[in-house]
């Protein structure tokens, strides 16, 4: 077993040897790509599903509330550990709203149906197309809406779907903070973060600053950084340009109430299985 920045041999191409100087898992690569090298640095990748990972440096912290302890990487002879939470349904929810419900023609178009303040007129969405991931780990539960009336609009339904993604993220960060893992901001990447309204909603729900890189391909950048470190090339000159989303303090109480209502709906749904 080698370090991420070890010597993995050579790839022979056109009679030339190309050295392989870096190997790292995809989510760990995104962690490195986002520059999460210190304890409490956290990234979240929003694609079909969502993968959150927070660096705990040389301390393998065990959390017995549905989150996983894993190795982040070994670089420069130093092993860093991480805590990971996996959310099963994110981008596939938006795809379902587009392809099955026919609410909009493109994922980009979904943004205009979002209420940036998170208001859904009491509609809640359980995002369990394939069960629930962290921290619930329930493969039997299935998705559903609650609170729909004859006055419910497409905006309410679409916003409730996006809220469910934010609330799953908040559930994980809340558990982390119970274990004294301080998270000042969240660095996010993946296809969904192109939706600026979602990023602001996520910031409001978590009551934390959300940072998105201008180049959202953090996994590829992370793998490149590992190879650069192995080749003794300075990574500090790489672009660190970020977009920032700060929470709207006037919505804090409303978002806490919405989150608590969503948690109650999820808990009751799990109990009925």
PLM regions: where:
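ATP-dependent carbohydrate kinase catalytic cores
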Residues: 1-78, 89, 105-112, 119, ...
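Beta-strand segments within the central parallel beta-sheet cores of soluble alpha/beta enzyme folds
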Residues: 1-4, 44-46, 109-113, 160, ...
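A conserved active-site cap/scaffold subdomain adjacent to cofactor or substrate pockets
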Residues: 76-102
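Short beta-alpha connecting loops at secondary-structure transitions
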Residues: 74-83, 146, 206-212, 240-251
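Hydrophobic alpha-helical scaffolding
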Residues: 18-22, 83-87, 99-100, 135, ...
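Glycine-rich phosphate-binding/hydrolytic loop that grips phosphoryl groups
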Residues: 30-33, 87-88, 163, 200-203, ...
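Acidic, glycine/GT-rich loop-and beta-edge segments that sit at the periphery of enzyme/chaperone cores
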Residues: 102, 230-273
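Activation-segment/catalytic-loop signature of the eukaryotic protein kinase fold
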Residues: 117-219
């Amino acid at each position: 077993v080698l370090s991420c920045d070890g010597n993995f041999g050579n790839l022979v191409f056109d009679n030339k040897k190309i050295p392989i100087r870096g190997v790292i898992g995809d989510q760990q690569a995104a962690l490195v790509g986002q520059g999460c090298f210190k304890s409490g640095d956290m990234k979240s990748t929003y694609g079909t599903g969502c993968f959150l990972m927070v660096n705990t440096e040389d301390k393998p912290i065990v959390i017995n509330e549905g989150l996983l302890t894993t190795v982040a990487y070994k670089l420069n002879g130093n092993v860093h550990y991480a805590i990971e939470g996996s959310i099963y349904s994110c981008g596939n929810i938006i795809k379902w709203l587009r392809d099955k419900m026919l609410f909009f023609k493109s994922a980009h178009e979904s943004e205009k149906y979002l209420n940036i303040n998170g208001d859904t007129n009491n509609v809640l969405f359980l995002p369990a197309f394939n069960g629930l991931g962290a921290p619930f780990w329930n493969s039997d539960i299935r998705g559903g809406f609650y609170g729909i009336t004859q006055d419910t609009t497409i905006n309410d339904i679409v916003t409730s779907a996006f809220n469910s993604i934010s609330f799953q993220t908040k559930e994980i960060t809340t558990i982390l903070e119970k274990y004294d893992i301080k998270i000042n901001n969240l660095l996010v990447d993946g296809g969904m973060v192109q939706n600026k309204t979602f990023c602001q909603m996520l910031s409001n729900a978590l009551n934390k600053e959300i940072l998105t890189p201008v180049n959202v391909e953090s996994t590829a950048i992370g793998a490149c950084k590992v190879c650069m470190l192995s080749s003794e090339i300075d990574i500090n000159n790489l672009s660190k340009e970020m977009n920032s989303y700060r929470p709207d303090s006037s919505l804090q109480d409303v978002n806490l109430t919405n989150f608590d209502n969503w948690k109650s709906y999820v808990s009751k749904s799990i109990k009925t299985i």
